Amino acid sequence: SKFKHPIYGDELETFKMYQNREPRFYVNVFWSGMTWHGANKKTANVQFYFNGNSGPGKSHNYPPTGYLAHKFTNPSIDTSTGNYGYLDFPVFRYAEILLNYVEALNEYDPSNADITLYLNMIRKRAGVPDIEEVYPDAAGDQTRMRELIRRERQVELCFENLRYFDTRTWMTAETDNNMPVYGMNISAKDHKANGEFWQRVICKYDGGR
């Protein structure tokens, strides 16, 4: 169905699974059929299927999952004029400080009101409802709140090279990082609606080694 990207305003045909997602999804994730802004200012509809302009049949530089990380990209870049732009990569974000604090506080004092206070500061900035509005049973429930804090950390800090260390801190790597990597079927001949490209496939699995 027709969809207007909430960040760039581009109109494209896409599936419902890409519509009405939270704002951080659109900032962080790039999927086949979207328009890439930047580079040489020749905005292009990017195609990740086999013979698409960014697929394995046309390029050696393609995403095996059919997705790209879109975080920290600069749409003002124009390589045709030598403008490669600048982006500050965070070393320690304030959001991470808050997430560290609420995670520790939940382990020490699960009923402390600061947990929802500071967690909601992150969520408000991201444009999503307060945690207790979405999960009214979470406040004071240490196990449930631990799960939600870890999920919030996964979303807020995605593509910032922290997930690897987080799963080891939590001692969950053996299960969290021991599963197949799924993605779109990039060997498909096109990415038409209901075509083979959109079939979820295993992209990589090493058996947990």
Region spans (language model):
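Boundary/linker segments of alpha-helical solenoid repeat arrays
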Residues: 129-133
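Extended, hydrophobic/aromatic-rich amphipathic alpha-helical segments that build helical scaffolds
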Residues: 17, 21, 25-30, 89-122, ...
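Flexible loop/turn segments at secondary-structure boundaries
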Residues: 35-36, 111-113, 165-166, 174
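Long, intrinsically disordered, low-complexity segments
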Residues: 84, 88-91, 123, 134-209
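Flexible, polar/acidic helix-loop-strand segments at domain edges
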Residues: 5-94
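Intrinsically disordered, low-complexity segments enriched in glycine/proline and serine/threonine
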Residues: 74, 99, 106, 199-202, ...
